[in-house]
Amino acid sequence: WRMVWEQNVSTVIMATNTEERKEPKCAKYWPSGDPQSYGDLMVVNLGENHLVDYTIRSFSVQRAQGDSTMSIKRNITQYHFTSWPDFGVPKSPSGILKFLRKIKHSSPTGYGPIVV
């Protein structure tokens, strides 16, 4: 989250699931319910939209600024592709193409790089 903050990132892409055949594959780095602190950054999950091939999550990342009443807040969107099979490739490219189109048309300009 510190890198996301430092680079002024607004879009994060996750191209793998957290498990493969019920074994851990990728750490779940975002909060589901209660806000989570990462150093001086507080991450709040604002919501999730589960679609057929991917999930879109919205987060608020807030950084304390000196006095605890002063803070800076940014919104981050995570696009998580969930239809890639544990082994092999998808039967059809349509899901990944829709995913990429959504990211292309939804990512705002004027921010830092997209993090994958």
Curated annotation (Swiss-Prot):
GO terms for molecular function: protein tyrosine phosphatase activity. InterPro entries: Prot-tyrosine_phosphatase-like, Protein-Tyr_Phosphatase, PTP_cat. It is an enzyme of class 3 (hydrolase). It catalyses: O-phospho-L-tyrosyl-[protein] + H2O = L-tyrosyl-[protein] + phosphate. Keywords: Hydrolase, Protein phosphatase. The keyword Hydrolase applies. It comes from the Eukaryota. The keyword Transcription does not apply. Residues 1-116 form the Tyrosine-protein phosphatase domain. Substrate binds at residue 86. Its EC number is 3.1.3.48. Belongs to the protein-tyrosine phosphatase family. This is Tyrosine-protein phosphatase 10. It comes from Styela plicata (Wrinkled sea squirt). The lineage of its organism: Eukaryota, Metazoa, Chordata, Tunicata, Ascidiacea. The gene is STY-10.
